[in-house]
A protein has these predicted regions:
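Conserved acidic carboxylate
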Residues: 10
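Two-component/phosphorelay signaling modules centered on CheY-like receiver
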Residues: 13-32
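Acidic, metal-coordinating helix/loop segments flanking the phosphotransfer/catalytic sites
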Residues: 33-51
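Receiver (REC) domain active-site loop signature in two-component systems and cognate sites
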Residues: 58-61
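C-terminal output helix
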Residues: 109-118
Length: 126
């Protein structure tokens, strides 16, 4: 089975652990963690990832700015990006999708939703 590299960008250690816990249940995924958008950009410049999961509300650089910058990088134009956030308003969702996010998941999250979304976006059979 191919190994997919997944970047999880989340400032809350508890939420980051929950997302990582869910992803570890999927075979063939290598996970890298970042604590904010700036840290995420550093990781993205050092390696290539097959999937990015990011929060919106983070210090230093928020997730929407991260998505916008990532989408302007030709090597990441088609890499799936999942927003995971407490922002549940439809205009927040529309804005995130408009700047390039592929999925928008609101907290509280179910680990099964993270797993199913990652598998689908990476093309891993259920």
């Amino acid at each position: 089975m191919a190994n997919f590299k997944v970047l999880v960008v989340e400032d809350s250690p508890t939420m980051r652990q929950l997302i990582v816990f869910a992803l570890k249940r999927v075979r063939g995924i290598d996970i890298t963690e970042a604590q904010d958008g700036v840290d995420g950009l550093k990781k993205l410049s050092a390696d290539h990832y097959d999937l990015i999961l990011t929060d919106i509300n983070m210090p230093i650089m928020d997730g929407l700015k991260l998505v916008s910058l990532v989408r302007n990088d030709p090597s990441y134009k088609t890499v799936p990006i999942v927003i995971i956030t407490t922002e549940g308003a439809s205009e927040d969702r529309e804005r995130a999708l408009a700047i390039g996010a592929n999925e928008y998941i609101t907290k509280p999250i179910q680990t099964s939703r993270i797993i199913d979304t990652a598998k689908r976006l990476l093309g891993i059979a259920p």
